Amino acid sequence: MANTDRPALPHKRAVPPSRADSGPRRRRTKLLDAVAGFGVTLGSMFKKTVTEEYPERPGPVAARYHGRHQLNRYPDGLEKCIGCELCAWACPADAIYVEGADNTEEERFSPGERYGRVYQINYLRCIGCGLCIEACPTRALTMTYDYELADDNRADLIYEKDRLLAPLLPEMAAPPHPRAPGATDKDYYLGNVTAEGLRGVRESQTTGDSR
């Protein structure tokens, strides 16, 4: 049986609208709200424009900007990449593919035992995080300030080794070629090899000639 002893709820009386919500005052408030909404727009109209004339005048980039990758060389032209694939393992987007190969005395591309025979970076996947350059043990891979990578062909955004290698300077020799006379791979890693050869050997030869 239903309980009929429950007290009845009090009747809610409708609250009449305030006189402040109607009439000229209400219309004036709405007008001020509309003007306030354009405050930011009106304030920006008189500020100095920040539009850049791109691509006619590209703006500067930050000092540590992560742009297109570059495979670096030693001063005599040998490649710094040793084909270790650490950059590919560190890439969270699986954008790097590396195949290493062995150097020989007849055909040497890098100072050590191995070099990167195949090197690809897929810029359709690359997120520019820079983890690959942090993983590189020889500083073979760095990132440049070049950010104009747009293309209308997807295949052209997969960069091969020839597009990633740093250009040869006039004092460099294109590999393959032997190491500097008397130099080891450690001398290259320590920066003791210049475009003319091994620094210590050249200095000792100069000292011997002066005697």
Swiss-Prot record:
Membrane-protein topology: Peripheral membrane protein
PROSITE patterns: 4FE4S_FER_1, 4FE4S_FER_2
Region (Disordered): 1-27
A GO molecular function held by the record: iron ion binding
Cofactor: [4Fe-4S] cluster
Disulphide connectivity of cysteines: none
Cofactor note: Binds 2 [4Fe-4S] clusters per subunit.
Keyword terms of this UniProt record: 4Fe-4S, Cell membrane, Iron, Iron-sulfur, Membrane, Metal-binding, NAD, Quinone, Repeat, Translocase
Binding site for [4Fe-4S] cluster 2: C91, C126, C129, C132
EC number: 7.1.1.-
Residues that hold [4Fe-4S] cluster 1 according to the record: C81, C84, C87, C136
Main location: membrane
Cellular component per GO, a single term: plasma membrane
GO biological process annotation, one example: aerobic respiration
Swiss-Prot/TrEMBL catalytic activity: a quinone + NADH + 5 H(+)(in) = a quinol + NAD(+) + 4 H(+)(out)
Family, per entry: Belongs to the complex I 23 kDa subunit family.
Quaternary state and interactors: NDH-1 is composed of 14 different subunits. Subunits NuoA, H, J, K, L, M, N constitute the membrane sector of the complex.
Protein name per UniProt: NADH-quinone oxidoreductase subunit I
Species of provenance: Mycobacterium bovis (strain ATCC BAA-935 / AF2122/97)
Protein's gene: nuoI
